[in-house]
Structure formats: C-alpha cells, structure tokens
C-alpha cells in the first residue's frame, strides 16, 4: 500500500525522467541543426545561441516538430515513440492529480496512482534512452578527432 510520500516520490522520479527526455530531445534538435547548418566547420555562435533559446522556450510538441524538420528517419518508429513520450509527459504534467481526483485519500487509490506513474515512467524512460542515444551518436559523428585535440590542448575549438 502506497503512502502519500511514496506517491509523491514516484511522481518526482517520473517528472525527472520527463525532463531528461525533453533535454535529450532538445540536444538532438540542436545537434542536427548544427550539422545541417555546418556549424561544426564554420562556427556561428550567435545562430546556435538563438536556436538553443528557441528550443528551450518551446513546448515538447514543438521540439518534436523541429526534430522532424531537422532529421530524417528511415521509418516513423522513433517519431511514434517520441509522440507516445509526449502524450505520457502531458498526462503527467497536465492534470495527473486532477484525473485521479479523490484516489489520493485511500491506500487502494494511491496504489492505482503509483501504477499509473509506473507506466508513464516506463514510457518516458524508453523515450529518454532513445533520444539520449541519438544525441550521443550525433556527437560522435559530428565532433572530429581534430576538434577534440584542439580542445584538449587548450586551443579553442571555436574560431
């Protein structure tokens, strides 16, 4: 039987996972935009800063739309998964407690709420793992050995 503290802890853990997903997805969009605009060869810190600001001020749904504009996928499986993540995130942050209403007042109700949070957490966790893997793959592909050597030798990688 879940206590209120356990319920709130699970909500917090799920919220953290949602934010990790959002951050990783934003990183993928920014890295893709950098690649598409050749910022890795011809740096444009002002354009990159503007792009980051737009990403950070956007809803997750808008960031997902940006991703579809910047990066092409062979199939829709990843986009479909990210859309499920968007739905899970919105269920969490837009009315989770309202939807469950008085369930918080009983042990059985709180168990129900925790079970719902576990499902949302699992969906968001899977989305975060995919987005984080994409971000890592883009970074490995785009950051050259020469740029790494310049950075580690004390030279600025930005001209």
List the predicted regions and their residue ranges:
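Histidine-centered, metal-coordinating catalytic motifs and their short helical/loop contexts
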Residues: 78-102
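Short secondary-structure subsegments characteristic of cysteine-rich extracellular domains
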Residues: 105-124
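Amphipathic alpha-helical coiled-coil segments
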Residues: 123-134
């Amino acid at each position: 039987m879940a206590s209120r503290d356990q319920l709130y802890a699970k909500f917090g853990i799920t919220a953290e996972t949602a934010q990790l997903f959002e951050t990783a997805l934003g990183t993928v969009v920014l890295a893709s935009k950098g690649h598409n605009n050749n910022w890795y060869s011809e740096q444009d810190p002002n354009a990159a800063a503007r792009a980051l600001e737009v990403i950070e001020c956007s809803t997750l749904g808008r960031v997902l739309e940006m991703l579809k504009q910047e990066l092409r996928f062979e199939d829709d499986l990843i986009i479909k998964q990210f859309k499920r993540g968007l739905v899970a995130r919105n269920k969490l942050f837009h009315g989770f407690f309202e939807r469950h209403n008085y369930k918080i007042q009983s042990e059985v109700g709180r168990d129900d709420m925790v079970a719902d949070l576990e499902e949302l957490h699992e969906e968001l966790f899977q989305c975060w793992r995919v987005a984080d893997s994409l971000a890592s793959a883009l970074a490995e592909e785009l950051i050259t050995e020469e740029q790494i050597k310049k950075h580690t030798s004390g030279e600025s990688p930005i001209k």
